[in-house]
Amino acid sequence: MIQRLWASRLLRHRKAQLLLVNLLTFGLEVCLAAGITYVPPLLLEVGVEEKFMTMVLGIGPVLGLVSVPLLGSASDQWRGRYGRRRPFIWALSLGVLLSLFLIPRAGWLAGLLYPDTRPLELALLILGVGLLDFCGQVCFTPLEALLSDLFRDPDHCRQAFSVYAFMISLGGCLGYLLPAIDWDTSVLAPYLGTQEECLFGLLTLIFLICMAATLFVTEEAVLGPPEPAEGLLVSAVSRRCCPCHVGLAFRNLGTLFPRLQQLCCRMPRTLRRLFVAELCSWMALMTFTLFYTDFVGEGLYQGVPRAEPGTEARRHYDEGIRMGSLGLFLQCAISLVFSLVMDRLVQKFGTRSVYLASVMTFPVAAAATCLSHSVVVVTASAALTGFTFSALQILPYTLASLYHREKQVFLPKYRGDAGGSSGEDSQTTSFLPGPKPGALFPNGHVGSGSSGILAPPPALCGASACDVSMRVVVGEPPEARVVTGRGICLDLAILDSAFLLSQVAPSLFMGSIVQLSHSVTAYMVSAAGLGLVAIYFATQVVFDKNDLAKYSV
């Protein structure tokens, strides 16, 4: 009895709760990083053309871009014995587990269900890839909200999101490293099977352990009636499942895109310049990262993904995939190192110099990847892009914090600004309140004057207490919908959306470009070209007050 009481107190300790929540963060990033590395070659092996393979990779980001605001609002309104966040975390985690089961066993399941296995195998594989990308990326939103609920004190919040960012980086390193191992010759091969089955079996085991940790997380009880709807959520009438109310809710969902368009069109020029620069930079980097392993396997090692297993061409391709995974692992490791020293770099050289240097570094690394046939040079170039990756995680959000801290200077035509705050929720909130200088944002980024540890940006921030000014209540009449002032969380959400949009564009066009050029080197050439475009827009970013007159903002 005493031991059980001691264990219960230990699990309820603040640091124990912090570790339990961030274990799932680690598990999610391991699965996503391994999926980015291994899924494109797997799609090519089963016969998916380059053009359609890249489109498949865009399914998850597109769905995430639309659904994250809805999920954030629904989580804020949820009432249940397991809290507001964990039911959504568990539901999305089940989607990740289902994808980890489907991807390596698509052919086997297709053979059980239908005589002509190829069409069904492709459908199951695409379903698994879409589930992994969608559920994995969207699950970060309720995880961040849970951290914010549990650690509401400012000092504790900064510590919580620092650990959150570190666990994401650590998970990325492991996720990129696992596909680089030849599991066919490992001691696990007799028990787990082929390379794919071993890899995804380990991912499933890691994710199950991390998911089980959330069972011991103690969420705060949410008392009282549901708070007024904020963001995008279904009103109380729809909870009765009345068909007319449900239909009204779905019809009113069509107001989402006009509202988003209105908010984006009203974006201040300083933020618009920053958004365009970040979007171009992310497009260049994601084009490089998404297709790097396929480039190494086909272009550098001269392998053939559709060759029969055991042949020389297939063996070369598999070796290239493992070497490509090692390059992405080094990219993540270098980005982690630069994230740790980013504060010192900014203090010594300034934000402008560090940001421009990081953007200029990328096309140089991508060009070296295109021109060189040396495995060492190509791998070193991939590692060098970690500097760009780190800077894009931190500096744009530092600049956004600067803009909002000095609104009268940087945002003089801030229409509808109601003072920059909407008040904090009386109940637990989904995200941190407005960031302070040197404080970590809820997505792991840092405010001005500090640097954080690498954390991939989430898709969009859902309903929160941090000055979100997009109030569209589904189910209310149009005249009841109002938009108050813009807050920093909305503008951070728009900046964060650049990350998902940067995955959608390459997914739509890169496959066709490669088919027309008949060379996977087109991946790296396109990345280098986008990097050059990003340099131009990076030079147009407003870094200080002197730039306002220089660019006539």
Curated annotation (Swiss-Prot):
Keyword Transmembrane attached: yes
GO MF terms held by the record: sucrose:proton symporter activity
Tissues expressed in: Expressed in the epididymis. Primarily expressed in the prostate, but also in other tissues.
Protein name: Solute carrier family 45 member 3
Organism, scientific name: Mus musculus
Gene name linked to the record: Slc45a3
GO cellular component: membrane
Function of the protein: Proton-associated sucrose transporter. May be able to transport also glucose and fructose.
Subcellular location: Membrane
Record membrane topology: Multi-pass membrane protein
Lineage per the UniProt record: Eukaryota, Metazoa, Chordata, Craniata, Vertebrata
Catalyses which reaction(s): sucrose(out) + H(+)(out) = sucrose(in) + H(+)(in)
UniProt keywords, alphabetically: Membrane, Symport, Transmembrane, Transmembrane helix, Transport
pH dependence as annotated: Optimum pH is 6.5.
GO biological process, one term: positive regulation of fatty acid biosynthetic process
